[in-house]
């Protein structure tokens, strides 16, 4: 942990008393908001007068070019976004361990996509949405603020980037780390910092809360901080009972009765637009509205094109950890630029937030900006890592002396774009890597991690509908047993272990069962 500041904890002079965060999935800035430059020329996006392109081959100076268009579909395939794929997208060549890093030319998106699927670059990776296709974002960009310099925290996939949102580190993970996921990631989070300084937080989940990737969040003391979104969020807004820090987790599984609204390809962006609309309208109607900052951001770019070079100089390693062989990643460069919207009655219409003014000359907006902003606005006692100490803070966007009274009460309506046949078919689709990680975390809560099938075969035969039911059942059971244990007065630092009850009269454990039992044990 970074050394504690001398200011101590307590409230600041900021008018913001509640920060609401929604982290969506796998879209780049240019893909979602690049064409919004047509609405506001100050946005660093794309335009027809300055066309952007990538070559089919970066090694051929005479290569044909694929130009960035505005014909993205609501339901897209899922491009490559592994560490290796991102390296090629950013630097225009396959991974090498060069030091220092080469110049990030952002010219390898087409080459990488074509190696995966012929035609994917022109139809998917090099396409974006025009503003009229994303009417909720269109109104929010015009009415509030867009940040055109927010990068993912590292050039990798969902899990490590989401870990930075609340902890300013992935604890050395730069891809799915199943062993650590079993134990629970051990790093301190901003949730503990808020609690220690007397502030409140709530996690409003829709399918499975990935905040449970952090080990501490599984403890009995935090069981009452988890709320079902559809049962609690609008009610808490209406009653003025939102906590100081609100985390909204979208639906990560697309089923017919409740389509996914996390914007992950192939999920329909209409569902994501409707989720943002629903959240905004509930916040706008709340008596707490004049004290709210609502942040919408995406965890990583998902393999979609973006033209702004990723920062490779002056990015601090958060905690001295280095990624595994063969890449030995030092966590010293950021990922690709992602969409970010900032919404509050304290923001002037049409604001564009560019690079931050400090705290360091190389500082950038990235996911660690969220805990950094919480620390600054709520005057928390200490930083979490060197990364949130370095990251830009969002308070600069609060650029008024009084709250606006003309903020829209409602946002545009969007029709759902899929029919019953498509929805049923998608319930039978294979799982994404992140969905598999959610299953693995759910298995630990349920006690299934002691079985020989964990983690490698547990999700093998699951489709989307099976997985959605599994994680919901696992969390419901874990949460219910945790509530009972807390009501019984058990140690607040305890984590309920459902495997004990299920194995009390079972046969002796196999080696694999013993191994995974060891992995989740603090000792």
From Swiss-Prot:
Signal peptide limits: none
Keywords noted in UniProt: Hydrolase
Gene3D superfamilies registered for this protein in UniProt: Alkaline Phosphatase, subunit A (3.40.720.10)
Tissue specificity annotation: Expressed in root tips, cotyledons, on leaf margins, stems, young anthers and funiculus.
Main EC class the enzyme belongs to: hydrolase
Induction (free text): Induced by auxin in roots. Not induced by inorganic phosphate deprivation.
Entry annotated with the keyword Cytoplasm: no
GO cellular component: plant-type vacuole; plasmodesma
One of the protein's GO biological processes: phosphate-containing compound metabolic process
Matches recorded under Pfam families: Phosphoesterase
Region (Disordered): 44-64
The reaction(s) this protein catalyses: a 1-acyl-sn-glycero-3-phosphate + H2O = a 1-acyl-sn-glycerol + phosphate
Consequence of gene disruption: No visible phenotype under normal growth conditions.
GO molecular function: lysophosphatidic acid phosphatase activity
Chain intervals with Polar residues compositional bias: 52-64
Enzyme Commission identifier(s): 3.1.3.106
The protein's role, per its UniProt record: Possesses specific phosphatase activity toward lysophosphatidic acid (LPA) in vitro. Does not show phospholipase C activity. May play a role in signal transduction and storage lipid synthesis. May be involved in brassinolide-mediated signaling in root development.
Family the UniProt entry places it in: Belongs to the bacterial phospholipase C family.
This protein's name: Non-specific phospholipase C3
Gene source species: Arabidopsis thaliana (Mouse-ear cress)
